[in-house]
């Protein structure tokens, strides 16, 4: 069974999604509120996680462990650094760089996490 987790950092990023879903249950886990329900025939869990990678990771982990989501979508600007991306655009990455992780003084290229490929996820 497919269950999709939808995460947004700010209320404005998830409000319209919650308005379009049939909410069957609302649960508070830690600082986050999870709305469980359906969009069409698809089961969804929607939450505003707060800004930042740690908040997103906590929310995504909760969705995976507690709500057993099979897919996760991040809605919102997602920290875009590209001025050509507009509200409503859908962006699917094929490669990614951890842009704010800098360990060049230790001889690694920008974005490199030791033990991981530079851009392939």
Where in this protein do the model-derived segments appear?
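Phosphate/ribose-phosphate-bearing ligand recognition and processing surfaces
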Residues: 1-2, 86
């Amino acid at each position: 069974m497919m269950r999709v987790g939808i995460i947004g950092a700010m209320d404005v990023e998830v409000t319209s999604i919650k308005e379009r879903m049939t909410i069957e249950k609302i649960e508070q886990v830690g600082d986050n509120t999870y709305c469980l329900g359906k969009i069409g025939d698809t089961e969804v869990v929607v939450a505003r996680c707060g800004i930042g990678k740690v908040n997103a990771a906590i929310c995504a982990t909760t969705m995976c462990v507690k709500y057993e989501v099979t897919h996760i979508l991040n809605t919102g600007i997602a920290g875009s650094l590209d001025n050509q991306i507009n509200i409503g655009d859908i962006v699917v990455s094929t490669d990614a760089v951890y842009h704010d992780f800098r360990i060049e003084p230790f001889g690694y290229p920008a974005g490199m996490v030791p033990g991981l490929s530079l851009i392939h996820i």
